[in-house]
A protein has these predicted regions:
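Flexible, non-catalytic linker and terminal segments flanking ANL/adenylate-forming cores
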Residues: 1-30
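Conserved AMP-binding/adenylate-forming core of the ANL superfamily
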Residues: 24-28, 33-37, 45-90, 94-98, ...
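Anion (oxyanion) recognition and catalysis
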Residues: 101
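Structured binding elements
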Residues: 104
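Short beta->alpha connector loops at strand-helix junctions that form conserved
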Residues: 110-111
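Conserved ATP-dependent adenylate/AMP-binding module captured primarily in the ANL superfamily
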Residues: 114-132
């Protein structure tokens, strides 16, 4: 006979949620690039990034991302291409990440603190055609 599973059997982590936390989150049927555009439009005059005391607004961030996405496309990076990001945690990483996803390419994050053999393995395993 068919036995219904409790929500906690299917998703046991929900037992750990404090009461009042919504366990059912809905997401828009949009790409990450579209969500980025919506967010940057909504909060365009607010600060998106503070890095070493320098502030970048959401509007400025979107402009930088769009310029870099255009440059990547001009270099021949296309939808489905894998692009490795070998960058420190910086505004450049954020700009690169969103530029890559906006043109439909796939981000392969690689930590620059890895030793060379780890970086080599990740590059080969991911099939990245380009690296930033």
């Amino acid at each position: 006979m068919f036995k219904l599973k409790s929500i906690y059997e299917e998703r046991p982590w929900l037992k750990l949620y404090p009461s009042g936390v919504n366990a059912n989150v809905t997401f828009p049927n949009k790409s990450v690039g579209e969500v980025f555009d919506d967010t940057t439009e909504k909060w365009k005059n607010r600060t998106a990034i503070i890095f070493y005391g320098n502030k970048i607004s959401f509007k400025e961030l979107r402009e930088m991302v769009d310029r870099f996405a255009t440059a990547l496309a001009a270099l021949g990076i296309r939808k489905g291409d894998r692009v490795a990001l070998l960058l420190l945690n910086s505004p450049e990483y954020i700009i690169s990440f969103y530029a890559v996803v906006k043109i439909g390419a796939v981000v392969t994050p690689i930590s620059p603190v890895y030793v060379s053999s780890e970086i080599k393995h990740q590059l080969e395993d991911s099939g990245a055609e380009s690296i930033i």
